[in-house]
Amino acid sequence: MSIIDVRDVSLSYFTPKQETEALSGVNMEIEAGEFISIVGPSGCGKSTLLFLISGMLKPTSGRVLIDGRETDGVSTKVGYMLQRDHLFEWRDVLSNLLVGAEIRRMDRGQAARRARELLDRYGLSGFAGHNPDQLSGGMRQRVALIRTLVTDPDILLLDEPFSALDYQSRLTLAEDVYKIIKDQGKTAVLVTHDISEAISMADRVLVMSKRPSSIIAAYKIRFEEGEGLSPWKKREASQYNDYFNSIWKDLDGHAVVS
C-alpha cells in the first residue's frame, strides 16, 4: 500500500466573480521510503499540492490518503521544510529544535534527547547553545531539517528548501539533506524549479503542466553506474543529460509567458 495516494484531485479557488482552477485530475502514488521530486512551471501549483498532502488544504474534488486514510486536517505523519528556515532568533538552536514537539505536546525530555542525538549524528552538537544569527545559511537549513525530524514524521515535504542559498551551498546542503533523509528512512517529496536538483536527489521525478495543472510525465531515475549514487555522483552519471533534456522538453511546452 502506498504511503501517499493522491486520487483524481482537483482544486479551485473561488471569488465572488470567478472560479480559478489550480489543479485538475492529479493522480500520484508514492511508496514508503521513496524520494520524489516535483518540477513544473512557475505558479503551476507545486506548493499547493504539498499543502494538500499535508492536510492544510482540502481538495475541491478527489481524495488524498496518507497511509490508507483520507486526510482530515494536518497529519502528525507529515513534516514540512520550507524555503525559509523560520528559526526564532531569540531561542538557541536546541530550543528551536523543540518547537514542533512543544506544539504537539510531546514529552519535553524525550524530545530534547532526540534533538541532541540528531545534532550529534549530523555534526552540529557543538552548536546546541548558539543562536541562529551565529549560523551560516546552510547550517540554519540543517537545523530546520533536524527540527522537522525531532517529531519523527514518516513523510517530509520539502518546498524549495535550498532556493535562498548560493549555488555552492545549495549543492552541499542537497547532498547532506539527501543523506539524512535516506539515513532516517523517510519518504520525501521535494518541490523545486531546478531540474538538476530534481534528478540528482530523486528516485522519481514528476512533471506538472501549467494551470490548470496535472502530472504530464513521470521518470524513474536509474543509472547504469548502479544504485546508491550520491546526488553529486548522479550529476556525473552517463544518463543524467538524457533525463535533463527529456524533462526540459516536457516543461518547455508548458512555460508560463508573462
Residue ranges, per PLM feature:
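Conserved ABC ATPase "signature" region
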Residues: 98, 109-127, 179
